[in-house]
Swiss-Prot record:
The keyword Ribonucleoprotein applies. GO terms for molecular function: rRNA binding; structural constituent of ribosome. It holds the Pfam family Ribosomal_L4. Part of the 50S ribosomal subunit. This is Large ribosomal subunit protein uL4. Keywords: Ribonucleoprotein, Ribosomal protein, RNA-binding, rRNA-binding. Transmembrane segments: none annotated. Gene3D superfamilies: 3.40.1370.10.
Amino acid sequence: MKIDVTTLEAKKAGSVDLTDGVFALEPRGDILHRMVAWQLAKRQAGTHKTKGRSEIALTGKKFVKQKGSGGARHGDRKAPQFRGGGKAFGPVVRSHAFDMPKKVRALALKLALSAKAKSDNLVILDEAKLAEPRTKAAKDAFEKLGLKSVLIIDGAELDANFALAARNLPNVDVLPVQGINVYDILRREKLVLTKAAVESLEARFK
């Protein structure tokens, strides 16, 4: 699969051959859904908590005698049916993460890359570098390329000027290749890969 390479000035800079096994797979919405659910569950804080009846700071004394009152039988005021009592089956601090096989995770990433390539939302950039960290320079470059909602993946090391310039722009994310993930790919309309990122990804999936 051959695709044109462009520069930040929107000029053609040759072409690159993409591996079909990484960028030309048939779409699988079920795998992508599983992967996004896994990512979102994994990043949940899980710090929500309510107090059960054993944690409420009240006396445990039985407040009404067992028989003869004419009312229902009760133990102490910490029971869930009373105001100020403990919560029955409330949330506890826990991890929401669940297991996902490595092969499924790898497949999901390849499917996300393939989905962008198939929908013509994949752009290959010669390099993501700027002479100085100016947001206007990055904004002008993205406008020339027609990029409004975009995830930009560079090589293992980001260009500091480019990363700083793009940081203030809305709907623009810049990540090193080791940070690439399915959720961020799908949440942006366009995916931009530098040539260095393409080489790293293809080496990773060999």
